[in-house]
Amino acid sequence: MKRIAKAKNKFNIFIEEVPIPKISPTEVLIKSKYTLVSRGSEIWRRYVRPEAIQQKMMGYCLTGEVVETGSLVDSFSIGDKVAAVAPHSEYVSVDTADKKLTPSIVKLPDKVDLIEGIFWPLSTSA
């Protein structure tokens, strides 16, 4: 699968090939449909400044479809349309029991399409 990564120094953004994540019992695997690049926190703070940022931290707004669920996950099912705090990547694993980000993933209502849902993480902060 492909994901966006950042090397050291300014403006070094690239697409790299990495394995599809394996999920734990409390995680779901999402096949990404859309990710949102934030002008402030990503373009300026992460891409323009010279310090390296952890690759898993590249991105935080994603929508897609659940394609696999861990054995302890009962709140999401395969095929669910979701928005998540997750990086720019073709596939991402999201921990449904993560208490640091509450919630880090939500089901999108039928009336909300995946493009609209991409703004969910931004709409939760003020």
What role is predicted for each listed range?
Residues 1-2:
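Extreme N-terminal starter segment of soluble prokaryotic enzymes
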Residues 5-12:
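Extracellular beta-rich ligand/substrate-recognition surface
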Residues 75-126:
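NAD(P)H dinucleotide-binding glycine-rich loop of Rossmann-like/cofactor-binding domains
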Residues 9, 67-72, 95-98:
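Short loop segments at secondary-structure junctions
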Residues 44-49, 96-100:
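Short, flexible, mixed-charge acidic loops at enzyme active sites
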Residues 20-37, 45-88:
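Glycine-rich beta-strand-centered segment in the early N-terminal region that forms part
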